[in-house]
């Protein structure tokens, strides 16, 4: 983990309230595992005080560039969306433990399931798995057609299905509906998205090897503030820190 100023190479809107930013700097060389995230300070002013955790979508080590995707949900991300090419961003990272790429054997099939802004980490994950000789299938879930992004980026690595809750694009329904409808077969499931989606996947595929990337609000990003704790299945009093121990966990480890 390092703290550095990264240079904005580009910052553009790619879907409704969803932006893609490319940052450049030596800190990129510290990236090790798909599923890690960056903690960004969105302003040099006193407020907003807290950094924003943003997942890493793609890494280009040769160019020292990292791509992040974020949705404008409040003042912090609104300020981030205003950043222009050439500006500097105060970044802490890469943080967290990512997906277990090394545990997926060549020739196996990995089902990658993303919901909303949980889709971006699947891009780098797909790339790493394909390099290992793993077969990849994507199922991406969104609320509506205006929210859809990264379909083509995922498709270059494997079969890709898109579901929208309102049926305005792709398959109608939720990601679990698509998996059943298409009778998708897989050896391991890797997912990132909203808690209700993760909970549904955990329940439906309890007999499978499943890894979930948790989306929790974070304060410090380094495990000191206890803002992102998640209870485990061991007992009512046991917990893990999503920013430090995760954000990726085996499904049976965490209580949803």
From Swiss-Prot:
Sorted keywords for this record are: 2Fe-2S, Electron transport, FAD, Flavoprotein, Iron, Iron-sulfur, Metal-binding, Pyrimidine biosynthesis, Transport
| Cofactor(s) needed for function | [2Fe-2S] cluster; FAD
Signal peptide per UniProt = none
SUPFAM superfamilies reported for this sequence: Ferredoxin reductase-like, C-terminal NADP-linked domain, Riboflavin synthase domain-like
According to the entry, every stretch annotated as the FAD-binding FR-type domain falls at 1-101
Cofactor binding, per record: Binds 1 [2Fe-2S] cluster per subunit. Binds 1 FAD per subunit.
| UniProt-listed PROSITE patterns | FAD_FR
Q: Which GO terms describe its biological process?
A: 'de novo' UMP biosynthetic process
The residues the record assigns to binding [2Fe-2S] cluster are 220, 225, 228, 243
Which residues does the record give as FAD binding sites?
A: 52-55, 69-71, 76-77
Q: Effect of gene disruption?
A: Decreased growth rate in pyrimidine-free medium, extreme derepression of the pyrimidine biosynthetic operon, and decreased, but detectable dihydroorotate dehydrogenase activity.
- Pathway this chain belongs to: Pyrimidine metabolism; UMP biosynthesis via de novo pathway; orotate from (S)-dihydroorotate (NAD(+) route): step 1/1
Entries under Pfam families matching the protein: DHODB_Fe-S_bind, NAD_binding_1
Q: Which InterPro entries match?
A: Cyt_c3_hydrogenase_gsu, Dihydroorotate_DH_ele_sf, Dihydroorotate_DH_Fe-S-bd, Dihydroorotate_DHASE_ETsu, FAD-bd_FR_type, FNR_nucleotide-bd, OxRdtase_FAD/NAD-bd, PyrK_electron_transfer
Q: Which GO terms describe its molecular function?
A: 2 iron, 2 sulfur cluster binding; electron transfer activity; flavin adenine dinucleotide binding; metal ion binding; oxidoreductase activity
Q: How does it assemble?
A: Heterotetramer of 2 PyrK and 2 PyrD type B subunits.
Q: What does this protein do?
A: Responsible for channeling the electrons from the oxidation of dihydroorotate from the FMN redox center in the PyrD subunit to the ultimate electron acceptor NAD(+).
The entry's family comment says: Belongs to the PyrK family.
What is this protein identified as? Dihydroorotate dehydrogenase B (NAD(+)), electron transfer subunit
């Amino acid at each position: 983990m390092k703290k550095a100023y990264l240079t904005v190479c580009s910052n553009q809107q790619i879907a409704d309230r969803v932006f893609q930013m490319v940052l450049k700097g030596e800190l990129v060389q510290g990236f090790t595992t798909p599923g890690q995230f960056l903690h960004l300070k969105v302003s040099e002013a006193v407020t907003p005080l807290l950094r924003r955790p943003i997942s890493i979508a793609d890494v280009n080590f040769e160019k020292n560039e990292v791509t992040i995707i974020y949705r404008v949900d409040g003042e912090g991300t609104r300020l981030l969306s205003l950043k222009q090419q050439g500006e500097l961003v105060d970044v802490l990272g890469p943080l967290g433990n990512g997906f277990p790429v090394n545990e997926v054997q060549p020739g196996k099939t990995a089902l990658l399931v993303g919901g909303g802004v949980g889709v971006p980490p699947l891009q780098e994950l797909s790339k790493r798995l394909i390099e290992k000789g793993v077969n990849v299938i994507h199922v991406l879930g969104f609320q509506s057609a205006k929210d859809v992004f990264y379909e083509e980026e995922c498709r270059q690595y494997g079969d890709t299905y898109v579901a929208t809750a309102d049926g305005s694009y792709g398959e109608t329904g939720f990601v679990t509906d698509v998996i059943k409808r298409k009778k998708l077969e897989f050896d391991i499931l890797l997912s990132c998205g909203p808690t209700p989606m993760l909970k549904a996947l955990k329940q439906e595929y309890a007999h499978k090897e499943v890894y979930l990337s948790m989306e929790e609000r974070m304060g410090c990003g380094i495990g000191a503030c206890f803002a992102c704790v998640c209870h485990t299945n061991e007992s009512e009093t046991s917990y893990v820190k999503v920013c430090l121990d995760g954000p990726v966990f085996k499904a049976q480890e965490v209580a949803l």
